[in-house]
Amino acid sequence: MSWLARTFGAERRLAQALAAWNAGDHGVALDLWAPLAHRGHARAQSNMGAAFLEGRGVERDPGKAVDWLRRAAEQGDAGGQRNLALCYYEGWGVPQDQAEAARWYEKAAEQDDPDAQDMLSWMKLLGGGCPQDYAAARRWAEKAAAYGRVGSMARLGDIYHNALGVERDPVLAARWWQRAAVLGHAEAQAMLGAAYLAGKGVARDRVQALHWLERAEAGGAGELAAGFLRQARAKT
């Protein structure tokens, strides 16, 4: 069989496995992935690792998950790199190691994996497992936000609000919080409500302030929104 035929066959089986997985037929998917994974197919290895990590179609086994994910990651599979990073971050199947987590997140982020970009941005902002780097945190957050990652949108609002490596810019802060808020990010809703209450970056608007603060409270950010809500309600 030619290399092209083998490649086409592998891709066809991968597509069949993914369809089965999405339909909830996890065992069928694993039966299709396993032979490919044992033959060294990186995406199949990554998917096997994810299955063992989540305990879908097989008993959850972080050790086996790490074994498959490492094989995929070392071949350059971005999903494998991201999930291996998660294992190091959480200490699943390996000793917890923030530096190793950051290293693998960065490899995946450099391949345009938006979830890795989002997580790496957060780690760079806090200096967790890597040197604190506000410029890199902003850069990775911008990339992840472009893919719709709402946490990065909210983080960019915080970066501009708190002048973390940039000039303080209330307008940009409110703009990023708005983008995250309409997508349901409770903390961004609270901060946007506070911005409307104070007239920082947006025109002062108590109705809008109450709207977003109440949504934040309902969405689980009640502690953050509470003080602003009291102020907004006292003024109406």
Language model feature labels by segment:
Residues 13-14, 19, 36, 47-54, ...:
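Hydrophobic face of amphipathic alpha-helices that form TPR/SEL1-like repeat modules
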Residues 1-12, 35:
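TPR-adjacent "capping" and linker segments in tetratricopeptide-repeat scaffold/adaptor proteins
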Residues 1-6, 203-204, 208-236:
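Terminal, low-structured helical/coil segments at or just beyond the last alpha-helical repeat
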Residues 35-36, 71-72, 107-108, 142-144, ...:
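Canonical positions in the second alpha-helix
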